[in-house]
Swiss-Prot record:
Main location: cytoplasm
E.C. number(s) listed in UniProt: 4.1.2.4
Family: Belongs to the DeoC/FbaB aldolase family. DeoC type 1 subfamily.
Subcellular location(s) per record: Cytoplasm
The protein, known as: Deoxyribose-phosphate aldolase
Gene (UniProt): deoC
Organism for this UniProt entry: Bacillus anthracis
Molecular functions per Gene Ontology: deoxyribose-phosphate aldolase activity
Any one GO biological process: carbohydrate catabolic process
NCBIfam families reported in the protein's UniProt record: deoC (TIGR00126)
Length: 223
């Protein structure tokens, strides 16, 4: 298994510097990861540095709480794409989902999907650690209905990350034609392989190099 091509090499911490981002970009070139996943402020730099390389530029929308307005998320998406993003990972309105406001949740996702249409993949972060199994299923169903390309477990900034059980539930819910991304707490090759075996088609990790080299040392971040 070419595990590197399933990994979004991720750096999303608030104190990320340009030097940190450049390191992630160089590692992505070297190990040929699927993408680099960075905050929107770094998209232009990443797009310039990765031009001509088979590495996508992924950024985050409404991150990490998902509580910004739909209009803000749609604008963020358009702006990120204009600066070179080819994938966007958006956070759902978790509170609205828990309130049972399916219409708001679906519209929120739909507007981001429309803003990205034909230009970028949309991955929908449902923040599994805050949801019941019924809510996880509903979030996945609404994501598919709204036209998302992927569903994703976690931001890595909440109370928990990906589990094989959640990945299996999400895969069962979305079927074979929508991607499932495991993120949050995937630190070793064994972790990553477990997620793929459960149904993940992409893995988000900051410990990507350690995963590829099968080196458990140096894999310390939550994401």
């Amino acid at each position: 298994m070419n595990i590197a091509k399933l990994i979004d090499h991720t750096i999303l911490k608030a104190n990320t510097t340009k030097e940190d981002v450049m390191k992630v970009i160089e590692e992505a070139k070297e190990y040929k990861f699927a993408s680099v996943c960075i905050n929107p402020t770094w998209v232009k730099l990443a797009a310039e540095e990765l031009a001509g390389h088979d590495v996508d530029v992924c950024t985050v929308i409404g991150f990490p709480l998902g509580a910004s307005t739909t209009e803000t998320k749609a604008f963020e998406t358009k702006d990120a794409i204009a600066k070179g993003a080819t994938e966007v990972d958006m956070v759902i309105n978790v509170g609205a989902l828990k309130d049972g406001d399916n219409e708001l949740v679906e519209k929120d996702i739909y507007e981001v999907v429309q803003a990205a249409k034909g230009k970028a993949l949309v991955k929908v972060i449902i923040e599994t650690c805050l949801l019941t199994d019924e809510e996880k299923v509903r979030a996945c169903e609404l994501s598919v209905k709204a036209g998302a390309d992927f569903v994703k477990t976690s931001t890595g900034f909440s109370t928990g990350g990906a589990t094989a059980e959640d990945i299996a539930l999400m895969r069962k819910t979305v079927g074979p034609n929508v991607g499932v991304k495991a993120s949050g707490g995937v630190r070793t090759r064994e972790d990553a392989e477990k997620m793929v075996a459960a149904g993940a088609s992409r893995v988000g990790a900051s410990a990507s190099v350690a995963i590829v080299l099968n080196d458990a040392k140096g894999a310390t971040d939550n994401y």
